[in-house]
């Protein structure tokens, strides 16, 4: 629950947030982040591949800069396919601005408190596409109630999402952050992050 995580951290209910949290300037104002452990691409998902074609296994990540002109060709192709559709996104994520800026004028955007709630609406046909981490879908779409959901369209990564995902700490917990930084650096250096990502997500998420 995004609404409760940061207040819970600040209140001392837990000492670190570990939930694929994208590092952003806004979040860095109130949180202390570890070095990025991953830079995860995002993608659309559908149950009807007539809306968007099923993602090709092993397809390269399309890099988005966050500049509307530079990203225009990729976004325009998606706009054409998603025109008139309803897209579901989870509230409070780094993807909200991209979806609103790129598609709000040609599609309906429905915001959900949680990703599982959104996924069930996608399966039920109440929305026609969703947008989230590639790793989220890889981990969740093996479940029986969401087995009909498939990744669709290109994997989108690059500077648009910021430096990547990190673990979040209270501002005063610099010593704990340093310990995590050391462990993350070792996992990158020996290839552990890439090995695990390739095994479980079929995508290299090394920052």
Question: Could you describe each region identified by the protein language model?
Answer:
Residues 1-76, 148-159:
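Acidic, polar ligand-binding/catalytic clefts
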Residues 1-7, 72-75, 109-124:
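Short helix-initiation/N-cap motifs at beta->coil->alpha
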Residues 2-3, 14, 21-23, 36-38, ...:
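Solvent-exposed coil/turn segments that connect beta secondary-structure elements
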Residues 4, 20-29, 97-103, 116, ...:
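A ligand-binding cleft/hinge motif common to bilobed small-molecule-binding domains
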Residues 29, 40-42, 83, 127, ...:
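Envelope-exposed proteins and targeting segments
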Residues 39-43, 135, 142-182, 203-207:
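Periplasmic-binding protein-like
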Residues 44-106, 110-113, 134-135:
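Bilobed "Venus flytrap"/periplasmic-binding protein-like clamshell domains
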Residues 47-69, 73, 160-203:
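Extended ligand-binding regions for polar small-molecule ligands
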């Amino acid at each position: 629950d995004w609404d409760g995580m940061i207040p819970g951290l600040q209140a001392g209910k837990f000492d670190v947030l570990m939930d694929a949290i994208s590092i952003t300037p806004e979040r860095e104002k109130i949180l202390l982040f570890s070095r990025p452990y991953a830079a995860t691409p995002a993608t659309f998902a559908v149950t009807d591949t007539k809306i968007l074609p099923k993602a090709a296994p092993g397809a390269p990540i399309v890099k988005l800069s966050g500049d509307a002109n530079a990203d225009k060709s990729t976004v325009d192709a998606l706009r054409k396919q998603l025109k008139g559709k309803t897209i579901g996104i989870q509230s409070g994520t780094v993807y909200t601005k991209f979806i609103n800026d790129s598609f709000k004028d040609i599609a309906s955007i429905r915001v959900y408190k949680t990703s599982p709630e959104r996924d069930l609406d996608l399966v039920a046909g109440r929305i026609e596409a969703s947008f989230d981490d590639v790793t989220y879908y890889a981990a969740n779409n093996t479940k029986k109630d969401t087995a009909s959901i498939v990744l669709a369209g290109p994997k989108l990564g690059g500077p648009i999402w910021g430096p990547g995902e990190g673990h979040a700490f209270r501002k005063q917990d610099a010593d704990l952050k340093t310990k995590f930084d050391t462990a993350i650096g070792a996992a990158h250096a020996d290839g552990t992050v890439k090995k695990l990502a390739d095994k479980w997500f079929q995508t290299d998420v090394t920052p």
